[in-house]
Each structure stands twice: as structure tokens, then as C-alpha cells.
Amino acid sequence: MAAAGLLLALLTSSASAAEPLRILAFGDSLTAGFGLPDADGFVPQLQSALADKGIAARVINAGVSGDTTAGGLARLDWALGDDPQLVIVELGANDGLRGLDPRTTAANLDGILAKLESQKRAILLAGMKAPRNLGTEYTTAFDAIYPDLAARHNVMLYPFFLDGVATDPQLNQEDGIHPNAAGVKVVVGHMLPYVLKAIDGINRTAGQP
């Protein structure tokens, strides 16, 4: 009987060790995969890129098209239902497009990061930039939100989610805002080293090689 119990414990331990890392892509249409076939969105492309690196991960799509930082803060508890170890926070683009007060955007993101911190989750904050037609005062205040919050919360920052893609017609859909499949590939390729570094930090904390 004792031997059977030991075997069950070993099997349970092995199953737990084999469970894929849970990564939550918490954002707006840029993470939701707006306008793209399911296989071409940010989430499946990131999961595929991680698999190519030999990393077993389940990337969970918590992107809601049109969402603002206020909407993200309101639905955060629900989005964490799968208990992710790593959360990629990609919100703020719609705040900028609507010209919302950067102080409000910063406060909402601060609330999101504080809750994730309190739950001991690894965080990768993806930065966003305001549309350049909103004026220097607005864009300066908005663009500073992400590095300021990353420093305050001591979390990893990917400076600009659309780095290498924004304003390039070859990498965007007809609306000029949302990346096409090729654009998403660029986004994932640029962000991947940051995701890998975050995963390495999780493994070190857990005592894994």
C-alpha cells in the first residue's frame, strides 16, 4: 500500500514537471489577433516560436479588441483564471488613439501591475507610443508611462510592442494600425529574447536548470 502511494506521488510529480508553462497575453486587438486567421495571431506565433526553442508553453489569449487600460483593470481577475506564471501586459494603444489622459492610463496600468506583483507573477510590460499627431506634450507624457512604471515596479520592459512594424505598410493590414501575419512575426521575433529572459527568471526562482 505504501509502495502504491509512493508510485502515485512520483507519477503526480512527473506530470507536474511536464506541465507547460502558462503565459498570459493580456492586451487588446494587438494580442487578440484582430483581422488575422487564428494561426497568424500574436499568441499562436509566440507559442510556435517558443516551441522552436524547445520550450513547452501554453500561451493564453486574453486580448480583447478595443480594450483600454481601464477595461483591462476591470477584467484582470477573470483573465487570471488559468493561473499564469508569466503575464505579458500589452495595453494602452486604445487609450492613446482616444487621446485619454496619460495620468489615467498610468494609474490603470499601475493597478494591473500591483495586482500581478501581489500574486507573485512574472511580468513583461510591453510599451506603447502615442500617435504622433496628438502633439509633443501629450506624446511625451504618454510615452513616459511605460519606462516609469517598469522602474517603479521593477519589472521587465519591452519598450515598444510594434517596434519595427509601426508605419511600415508592408507589415500592416489595410488600416495601417494592426500588423499582418508578417508584421506579427517581426513583433514576436523582436520580443522573444525578452520572453525567454522572463522564463529563465521563472525557472531560476523554481530551482529548475
Regions found by a protein language model. Give the residues of each.
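Compositionally biased regions
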Residues: 14-17, 119
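Alpha-helical cap/lid subdomain in secreted, periplasmic
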Residues: 45, 52-55, 71-209
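Bacterial N-terminal signal peptides
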Residues: 2-13
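General secondary-structure edge motif
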Residues: 4, 26, 30, 96, ...
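Acidic-and-aromatic substrate-binding clefts and catalytic sites of carbohydrate-active enzymes
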Residues: 66-70
